[in-house]
């Protein structure tokens, strides 16, 4: 406001001092060049200042605000996934028709005071994201964490975020090449939790690199609050990049959307031990009956390969616990393992065809509760990228087959179509 007022006064002074006529003409002999330069400088400075303070808007990277003194930065992003689908039994009869906003999320990232003090906040508004926790707490918050980043190698965080256990879970649900993650990750994959996080990074894009990730968390999942069982979760993960890191953080994005010009590989392994967990799947699942708890261990091994539009991912993961079915109710801890393999090729950076095969194998003592000896799901997916993962259309077709199922009436075929839009 002060700057604008100065500009108006300067323009008025130009008219009065230099005797510019009503028709805009300057009387002969009057030299107004220097005065005009002064006025133009003020006007140009104001416009430049306004442009400098305007938010930066870029599709896929959100809306960013930062003052001219760089004392803070805030980036706002949102995304939504609208899904329709249908499931069919062995005789191709329709068993379910599905239409929903699968995800609707709002995210804030940035730093305060210094780029060394980073924060990340993410909220989820759909029923699957915001349904109450098993202990009845509000569950709107997905992420709320602050990091101290003393240099490019270290991150130290306190708050709620994804535990760094397996590749498939670390990938954002907005960066998938299928409508959703595999059945293997849905059962065995890690989840969000509250606690202390430490990360170490070494190397770069063109040379050997590694990442060492660890956390000590509450162990009961996101938004749990206080825990009275005395148990915590301890998680560690190591990632190796023999040929250097992926461009544009491609290790966290499915498919080779960057189109790596040289081969890139990631080899990863992780383990999470949840001491005295109150939930059937460690950081997620339903409550164990009564005051029951279990020590639950989850193990992970995965790899990624990308080269010129081709992408290959493989995941092996599982869970172990003592006496997983020793409860007075139907509750049980799913112990066993699973394998997921998927491959894709991106044509002209627009169309992607992907295939995936996922197998779940419960341990013998929990097979009666799981309802099968082996569950295998094969999926064919097609994605049309309009603006990368920020605006895309996805169609996938899944076929399910179970060995020794408890019921022969399980869904055999599922088709899903999803629109994803984000800023």
Which sequence ranges carry the predicted segments?
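Bacterial N-terminal signal peptides
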Residues: 9-17
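N-terminal periplasmic/intermembrane-space "pro-region" immediately following the signal or transit peptide
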Residues: 17-77
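Bacterial N-terminal signal peptides that target proteins for export
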Residues: 1-9
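Outer membrane beta-barrel transmembrane domains
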Residues: 279-280, 344-394, 398
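Outer-membrane beta-barrel "beta-signal"
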Residues: 234-245, 382-384, 391, 410-423
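Detector for outer-membrane/organellar transmembrane beta-barrel domains
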Residues: 229, 239-243, 247-363
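Outer membrane beta-barrel
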Residues: 62-222, 227-244, 263-266, 339-347, ...
């Amino acid at each position: 406001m002060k700057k604008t007022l100065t500009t108006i006064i300067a323009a008025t002074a130009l008219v009065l001092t230099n005797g510019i006529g009503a028709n805009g003409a300057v009387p002969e002999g009057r030299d107004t060049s220097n005065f005009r330069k002064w006025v133009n400088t003020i006007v140009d400075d104001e416009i430049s200042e306004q442009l400098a303070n305007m938010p930066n808007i870029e599709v896929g990277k959100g809306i960013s605000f930062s003052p001219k003194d760089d004392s803070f930065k805030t980036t706002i992003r949102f995304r939504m996934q609208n899904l329709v689908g249908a499931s069919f039994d062995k005789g191709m009869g329709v068993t379910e028709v599905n239409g929903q906003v699968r995800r609707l999320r709002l995210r804030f990232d940035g730093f305060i005071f210094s780029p060394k003090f980073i924060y990340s906040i993410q909220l989820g508004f759909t029923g699957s994201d915001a349904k109450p926790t098993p202990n009845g707490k509000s569950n709107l918050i997905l992420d709320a964490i602050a990091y101290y980043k003393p240099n490019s190698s270290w991150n130290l965080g306190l708050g709620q975020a994804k535990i760094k256990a397996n590749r498939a879970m670390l990938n954002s649900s907005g960066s998938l090449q299928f409508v959703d993650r595999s059945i293997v990750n849905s059962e065995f994959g890690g989840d969000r939790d509250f606690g202390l996080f430490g990360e170490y990074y070494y190397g770069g894009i063109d040379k050997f690199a590694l990442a060492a990730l660890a956390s000590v968390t509450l162990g009961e999942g996101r938004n749990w609050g206080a825990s009275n069982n005395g148990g915590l979760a301890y998680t560690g993960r190591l990632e190796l990049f023999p040929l250097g890191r992926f461009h544009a953080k491609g290790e966290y994005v499915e498919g080779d959307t960057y189109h790596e010009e040289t081969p890139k590989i990631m080899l990863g392994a992780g383990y999470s031990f949840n001491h005295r967990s109150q939930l059937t799947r460690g950081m997620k699942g339903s409550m164990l009956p009564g005051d029951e708890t279990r020590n639950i261990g989850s193990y992970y091994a995965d790899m990624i390969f990308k080269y010129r539009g081709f992408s290959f991912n493989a995941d092996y993961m599982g869970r172990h616990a003592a006496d997983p079915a020793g409860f007075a109710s139907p509750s049980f801890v799913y112990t066993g393992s699973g394998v997921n393999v998927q491959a894709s090729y991106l044509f002209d950076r627009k169309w992607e065809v992907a295939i995936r095969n996922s197998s779940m194998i419960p341990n013998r003592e929990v097979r009666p509760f799981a309802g099968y000896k082996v569950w295998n799901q094969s999926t064919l997916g097609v994605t049309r990228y309009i603006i990368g993962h920020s605006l895309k259309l996805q169609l996938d077709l899944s076929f399910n087959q179970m060995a020794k199922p408890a019921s022969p009436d399980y869904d055999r075929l599922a088709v899903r179509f999803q629109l994803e839009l984000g800023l």
